[in-house]
Structures are given as structure tokens and as C-alpha cells.
A protein has these predicted regions:
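Helix-boundary and loop/linker segments of multi-pass membrane transporters
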Residues: 5-7, 151, 155-156, 280-283
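Alpha-helical transmembrane segments of multi-pass membrane proteins
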Residues: 19-33
Length: 327
């Protein structure tokens, strides 16, 4: 019996997504409106652009829902997408100006996009396509089906070279935050490919151990020496702020320290939506990476925990769906 398309809609994933998106729009307006009014510009400017991206996300969801799965499995299709993404990444690195010390943004008629964000989706799509075609080999040969007993692949068309190439472009932005997320995404996709879980545990242990050694090495070597390494000079100050943001309140630690102040102001129940103190100019770029500190300041620990709970629901239902499909 042929199932109707609506049977494939998972409302347990869709509803938390919609709620989080609407909450995000409210928070963006709350975070940006006051400062916009002070500057004499429209308080709705940021929420309009974010609203457009929200609508585009719904259009994308509808497109993926309507498109035939076989089309997504075509090598030519994903190949064209990867080529287009590579061009966007290279343009954002070598043609555009820096934003807060790093490249990575492209502007089109008043809108800015960050190609590295789209790479996260493309990477999942690409690895899912590669691993889905190796399922019989994985069942028979485990992880060897992915590596062919070559830790350094000899074939330039090997999927590992493609992943390393794409992540390397992000690293030279430099954008180590997104590069780390892409590396973790690759690790998760490998673990979900069907290989024995002991290999995932080993990879995770190596990753955690390597990250710990790297952080302590940077601390021992010193941030100044680390900053002389090509590409990584940009992140040197961030490591310094990570260790103690209050040592340099006027420069590298300013944003992080003020995010701590914002969270401290919030307490259990917050100052109330729209009543943040730090967003009045004390916390730079409050609507970007540090927006959650404003959420805690306005909604408190309880409100922020409810939002995190929605993220957990979204993750758990998504992971449950993955397990169901594997079985």
C-alpha cells in the first residue's frame, strides 16, 4: 500500500522547530530594537531580515518535502551544490572584507549570508549519500568499508579528502568555531553510518583528548607565541579571553565579560522581556553569538531552561527518528 506524503511529516520535530523559530524572532526584536531606536533607525530592521530567512527556511522545508528522494541521491545534483558552495566559500574568504577580524560573509542587496552555515547542511547531505551506498560493505567489513584500510586515502576522489578540503576552507577564514562544528558533524555522521559503536567511542575519546591537549598546550606556550602561527593569529585573543575575560575588559575580554554580567543580572526569573541592561550597548553585537546571555538576562534561568528543553526535544526526537530508520 502506498503511503500518502503526509504520513512522513513528523510533527514532534516540526512543532518544536516552529516554536523555536518564533521565539528566535521575538528575542531578536527584543535584543536589537532599543539600540536601533537610539541610533535613529527602524527597530524592525533586523527582525524583517530574520523574518525573510525564516520564510525561506519554510520554503526550503516544503521543497525538500516535495522533492523526490531519488533526486537527492543523484551524484550530479550534490556535485553541483558542492561546487556552488565552494565558490561561495572562496569568494567570502578572498574577496570580501573582514567582519570582527574574520572573513566569511557575503552581502547581496542589504542581506548578508555566511556560506559556512550552509555547508553544515550540505556536509550532512553528502556524507549521508556516501554512507548510504556503502551499507552492504559496512555490514560486512565494519569501519574498513569507509577507510579501505587506508588511513591516508590514495584516491583523491575519496570522501575524506572532500570533507577535509571543505573544512580547510572554513579554517582559513579563519572560522574555527564553524570548522569545529563541521568536524563534530562528520564524527556524528560516521557514528550513524552503521559502524560498530566502539569505533565512535574511540574517535570521541581521541577528539576530546586532543582538544584538551591543544588547549593546555596553548596555555603553556602562551597566547602571544600562538598568535604568530599563520591563520591562528585571529583566535589568539579569543583563547586569552576564554581563560580569563576579566584580564582585558577593554579589548578581547569585553564581550565575554559583559555576557557574564548579563547572565548574572537575570537570576532565576529574569528582568522581563525587553528589559535587558547589557543590550543597551554594553554587550557588543548582542543579537549574534552572545544572544543567549540576553535571553538569560531577560527570561532568567527558568525561561532559558525551557528554551533549552525545546532544543532537547528537537534533538531527541530527531535522534529517535534516526534509530527508527536504522532498524
Amino acid at each position: 500500500m502506498k503511503l500518502e506524503k503526509r504520513h512522513f511529516l513528523n510533527y514532534s520535530i516540526l512543532i518544536p522547530y516552529l516554536l523555536l523559530s518564533i521565539l528566535g524572532l521575538i528575542i531578536v526584536y527584543s535584543t536589537t530594537s532599543a539600540l536601533a531606536i537610539q541610533k535613529g533607525v527602524s527597530p524592525f530592521g533586523m527582525i524583517k531580515s530574520q523574518g525573510i530567512f525564516f520564510v525561506l527556511s519554510l520554503v526550503t522545508i516544503l521543497f525538500i518535502y516535495k522533492v523526490k528522494l531519488n533526486n537527492l541521491k543523484k551524484k550530479a545534483f550534490i556535485g553541483i551544490v558542492i561546487i556552488a558552495e565552494t565558490i561561495l566559500l572562496l569568494l567570502s574568504r578572498f574577496i570580501t572584507d573582514t567582519v570582527n577580524g574574520a572573513h566569511g560573509w557575503l552581502s547581496f542587496g542589504g542581506f548578508s549570508i555566511q556560506p559556512a552555515e550552509y555547508l553544515k547542511i550540505i556536509l550532512v547531505w553528502y556524507l549521508a549519500l556516501v554512507f548510504s551506498k556503502k551499507q552492504e560493505e559496512i555490514q560486512q567489513y565494519d569501519y574498513q568499508a569507509l577507510t579501505h584500510n587506508q588511513w591516508i586515502p590514495r584516491d583523491l576522489a575519496d570522501w575524506r579528502w572532500m570533507v577535509l578540503f571543505l573544512i580547510a576552507i572554513v579554517v582559513i577564514m579563519p572560522d574555527l568555531g564553524n570548522a569545529t562544528i563541521l568536524a563534530l558533524t562528520t564524527l556524528i555522521m560516521i557514528s550513524a553510518s552503521g559502524i560498530a559503536y566502539r569505533w565512535f567511542s574511540s574517535l570521541l575519546a581521541i577528539l576530546v583528548g586532543g582538544s584538551t591537549v591543544l588547549l593546555y598546550s596553548i596555555k603553556l606556550i602562551g597566547v602571544e607565541r600562538f598568535s604568530k602561527i599563520p591563520v591562528f593569529g585571529y583566535v589568539a585573543k579569543r583563547f586569552s579571553a576564554f581563560y580569563n575575560p576579566f584580564n582585558d575588559l577593554s579589548d578581547s575580554g569585553h564581550q565575554l565579560a559583559n555576557s557574564y554580567y548579563a547572565m548574572s543580572n537575570g537570576g532565576w526569573f529574569g528582568l522581563g522581556l525587553g528589559n535587558s541592561i547589557e543590550k543597551q550597548g554594553y554587550l557588543p553585537e548582542a543579537h549574534t553569538d552572545f544572544v543567549f546571555s540576553i535571553v538569560i538576562e531577560e527570561l532568567g534561568f527558568v525561561g532559558a531552561s525551557l528554551i533549552l528543553a525545546l532544543f532537547c526535544v528537537l534533538f531527541l526526537w530527531g535522534y529517535g527518528q534516526e534509530i527508527h530508520l536504522i532498524r
